[in-house]
Swiss-Prot record:
(6S)-5,6,7,8-tetrahydrofolate binds at residues 109-112. NCBIfam families: fmt. The gene is fmt. One of its GO terms (cellular component) is cytosol. Belongs to the Fmt family. It comes from Phenylobacterium zucineum (strain HLK1). Gene3D superfamilies: 3.40.50.12230. Keywords: Protein biosynthesis, Transferase. This is Methionyl-tRNA formyltransferase. It catalyses: L-methionyl-tRNA(fMet) + (6R)-10-formyltetrahydrofolate = N-formyl-L-methionyl-tRNA(fMet) + (6S)-5,6,7,8-tetrahydrofolate + H(+). PANTHER family: METHIONYL-TRNA FORMYLTRANSFERASE, METHIONYL-TRNA FORMYLTRANSFERASE, MITOCHONDRIAL. Attaches a formyl group to the free amino group of methionyl-tRNA(fMet). The formyl group appears to play a dual role in the initiator identity of N-formylmethionyl-tRNA by promoting its recognition by IF2 and preventing the misappropriation of this tRNA by the elongation apparatus. GO terms for molecular function: methionyl-tRNA formyltransferase activity.
Length: 308
C-alpha cells in the first residue's frame, strides 16, 4: 500500500522500519521539527526523521498539520492509508480522512484504559498487571476510535518505563504490519471501544517527579519505575557541601518499617509511609547512572540519613 507515516520518538522507529521491510511504499514521513538535544542543545532531527532520511524517504516537519497548505500537500500524496505512532500533534479531520482507507494509530495501552500522552508511565505507576498495544482507526476524539488488533503484555515486578517501552514498541511494530495486511485484504474487523473503564494518561509534569516518601511503599516503588529513566523520580541527599539531587531509576518494595524518608540500613533501604523501598539503581546529579553498590562505593549513605 501507498502510505504516509507520522511519528517522532524512538517508540515509532521500529514500526516504520518494519513497514518499510514489509514492502509498503512510504510516500512521506511526517515528524516533529528538529529540537535541541544533548548537552550542546544542538538542533537535531527526531529519531523517526533520522531513520527516514537514512532510507531516502521524503520527510516533512510541519509546525502544525492544521496549516491549510500542509493539509493540501497531504491530500496530494494520493495515499491508501496513514499510520500514526506517537506523532505529537492532534490531527484535523481533513488529514485523518484524506487517505483512501483511513488513518490508523498504534497506541501503547489496552483502550479505553490510558487514552492520552503517557500510557506506558501511567500503567506502571497505577500498578497495572497487564497492558498492551493496539491498532485503532483514528477519529477526531482523543484515542476514541474502533480497535482493529491487540497484543497484550504483562508488566513485570521490576518493569521500568524504559523496558516496557521497548517491549511495546516491538509488539506494536509487528502488530501494525499484520493489521495493514488485513486492511489491504479487506479482512480487518473494527470493534468499538467500551464506554466503561475510560481513563486518561495525562502528560507527566516535572512537579510529579519528586519522591514523597510519606506515600505507601508500593506507590513510591511504582513511581520510581514508571518515571525511569525520564524524567526520573528524584530526592535530595544531604552531603557536607549541601543537598545533592539524586534520581532513583530502579527500586523494589520491601516489607520493612521505619521513618518515612530515612535510610534504614547502609544499602539504600528507605522508609516510606508503609513499608520500605530498596533503591537498586540511581543517578547523582551531573553523573551517569549507577547500580546502588557502585554508587555507595563513592558516596557512603549510612542508616539514619534523612532524604528529602
Amino acid at each position: 500500500m501507498r502510505l504516509a507515516f507520522l511519528g517522532t520518538p524512538d517508540f515509532a522507529v521500529q514500526a516504520l522500519a518494519e513497514i518499510v521491510e514489509a514492502g509498503h511504499e512510504v510516500a512521506c514521513v511526517y515528524s516533529q521539527p528538529p529540537a535541541p538535544r544533548g548537552r550542546g542543545h544542538e538542533l537535531r532531527p527526531s529519531p523517526v526523521h533520522a531513520y527516514a532520511e537514512s532510507r531516502g524517504i521524503p520527510v516533512r516537519t510541519p509546525a502544525s498539520m492544521r496549516d491549510p497548505a500542509e493539509i493540501e500537500a497531504f491530500r496530494a500524496l494520493g495515499l491508501d492509508a496513514a499510520v500514526v505512532v506517537a506523532f505529537g500533534q492532534i490531527l484535523p479531520r481533513e488529514v485523518l480522512e484524506a487517505p483512501r482507507l483511513g488513518s490508523f494509530n498504534v497506541h501503547a495501552s489496552l483502550l479505553p484504559r490510558w487514552r492520552g500522552a503517557a500510557p506506558i508511565q501511567r500503567a506502571i505507576m497505577a500498578g497495572d498487571a497487564v497492558t498492551g498495544v493496539q491498532v485503532m482507526r483514528m477519529t477526531e476524539g482523543l484515542d476514541e476510535g474502533p480497535v482493529l488488533s491487540t497484543a497484550t503484555v504483562r508488566i513485570d515486578a521490576l518493569e521500568t518505563a524504559a523496558t516496557l517501552h521497548d517491549r511495546l514498541a516491538a509488539a506494536g511494530a509487528g502488530l501494525i504490519v499484520e493489521t495493514l495486511a488485513q486492511i489491504a485484504a479487506g479482512r480487518a474487523v473494527e470493534t468499538p471501544q467500551a464506554e466503561a473503564g475510560v481513563t486518561y494518561a495525562k502528560k507527566i509534569r516535572p512537579k510529579e517527579a519528586r519522591i514523597d516518601w510519606t506515600r505507601p511503599g508500593p506507590e513510591v516503588d511504582r513511581k520510581i519505575r514508571g518515571l525511569s529513566p525520564f524524567p526520573g523520580a528524584w530526592f535530595e541527599l544531604p552531603t557536607e557541601k549541601g543537598p545533592v539531587r539524586v534520581k532513583a531509576l530502579l527500586s523494589a518494595f520491601e516489607d520493612a518499617e521505619g521513618p518515612a524518608g530515612e535510610t534504614l540500613d547502609d544499602r539504600l533501604l528507605v522508609g516510606t509511609g508503609h513499608g520500605a523501598v530498596r533503591l537498586l539503581r540511581v543517578q547523582r546529579e551531573g553523573r551517569g547512572p549507577q547500580d546502588a553498590e557502585a554508587f555507595l562505593r563513592g558516596t557512603a549513605v549510612p542508616a539514619g540519613v534523612k532524604l528529602s
